[in-house]
Amino acid sequence: VRFPRPYDNVDGIMTNVPGITLVTYHADCLPVYLYDPAHQAIALLHAGWRGTVDNIVSAGLEKMRKAYGTRASDVIAGIGPGISAACYETSEAVRILFAETFTDRDMERIFTEPHLGEDGARHWQLDLALANHLLLQNAGVQEISDGGICTYRNAKRLFSHRAQGAKR
């Protein structure tokens, strides 16, 4: 069943209507699932590096609070398959953007293994799952599960833009 969508280009959807299935598509970006058992509400978020820098987790929790009365402490969160830190090289420019959202201590955990990339510039390995886990914790979510599945390393079963390019 398809319903008309009054939106385009969003990185999150939510409902509290039983029987409605929400679907989001991801490549190497993370799906973040928020479930509020007290209000029978769910949200699905698309957390790429840009969404993570913009703290889509807090934005999703705030939308749920306003719409359903959700409290972060009641939320059960799940982080789905996405690219792992070992496979996700990012630039110094991306790291600088993250520094606007995360503390120095968190930055040391999220960005590891500084090295020179093929372009001769400084690059880092980014742990996107850990970054979103920290955002969830900082927002007050206490129950967080992360399956730890890397899309890049499992590209035969899951789509990975970095492993497969644009073909789907």
Explain the meaning of each model-derived region.
Residues 1-168:
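Active-site microenvironment for binding and transforming phosphate-containing groups
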